[in-house]
Amino acid sequence: MLNAREEEVLNVIIENVKLKGYPPSVREIGEAVGLSSSSTVHSYLKRLEQKGYLRRDPTKPRAIEVIMSELSKNPSSHPLTSELSRYSDEELISIPLLGEVAAGVPLLAVENYDEKVTLPRSFTGYGEFFMLSVRGDSMIEAGILPGDLVLVRRQESVSNGDIAVALLEDEATVKRFYKEKNRIRLQPENSLLSPIYVQEVKILGKVVGLMRKI
């Protein structure tokens, strides 16, 4: 059983993932529940992990994972279960982590199917997906930070303003896409950096979400 504060912390994580596609930071959790000390927030996260409600891997850039099966063992025991019950095992999908993508200079995306990330289908929607680990800081003003994992839906075209993973001479980069009159602009979300202009580019997919280690 969770006490009121533990339940509040868990609910903040769930709601943030539902609304934004990635978990809140320790600071954001603290602000949401009225805790000014990051160490206190970490202690609550540790308790939730020990009780089987969360799983974290401090060695990898993964988001906090809410363990649905632990809650669903006794559906009447916890008020959050009704919100989480729709994430059944049948709705979980394994998404390959292909390597790194630069949010800065283009960087080769090395395919590595040995690593996978499991996500609820309701988070991803339908389609073919892969994930990439972000390096560089050119997308920080869009909330994409070094070490984040971006969730990418495979598609060959995107709309103006979409954040895309583009292939430039066999190197992948994540930028905001704009098709202009006689060129394509790959726009960083960092006011200190300049856009990349090209005549043509291969689109690998659209960034539809991200995960962050906290």
Swiss-Prot record:
A biological-process GO annotation: negative regulation of DNA-templated transcription
Site (Cleavage): 103-104
InterPro entries linked to this entry: LexA (IPR006200), LexA-like (IPR039418), LexA/Signal_pep-like_sf (IPR036286), LexA_DNA-bd_dom (IPR006199), LexA_repressor (IPR050077), Peptidase_S24_LexA (IPR006197), Peptidase_S24_S26A/B/C (IPR015927), WH-like_DNA-bd_sf (IPR036388)
EC number: 3.4.21.88
A molecular-function term among this protein's GO annotations: DNA binding
Keywords attached to this entry: Autocatalytic cleavage, DNA damage, DNA repair, DNA replication, DNA-binding, Hydrolase, Repressor, SOS response, Transcription, Transcription regulation
Pfam families tied to this protein: LexA_DNA_bind, Peptidase_S24
DNA bind region: 26-46
Highest taxon listed in the record's lineage: Bacteria
Enzyme class: hydrolase
Active site location: 138 (for autocatalytic cleavage activity), 175 (for autocatalytic cleavage activity)
Catalytic activity: Hydrolysis of Ala-|-Gly bond in repressor LexA
Quaternary structure (record): Homodimer.
Function noted in UniProt: Represses a number of genes involved in the response to DNA damage (SOS response), including recA and lexA. In the presence of single-stranded DNA, RecA interacts with LexA causing an autocatalytic cleavage which disrupts the DNA-binding part of LexA, leading to derepression of the SOS regulon and eventually DNA repair.
Family under the similarity heading: Belongs to the peptidase S24 family.
Name of the protein in question: LexA repressor
Source species of the chain: Desulforamulus reducens (strain ATCC BAA-1160 / DSM 100696 / MI-1) (Desulfotomaculum reducens)
Organism lineage string: Bacteria, Bacillati, Bacillota, Clostridia, Eubacteriales
Gene: lexA
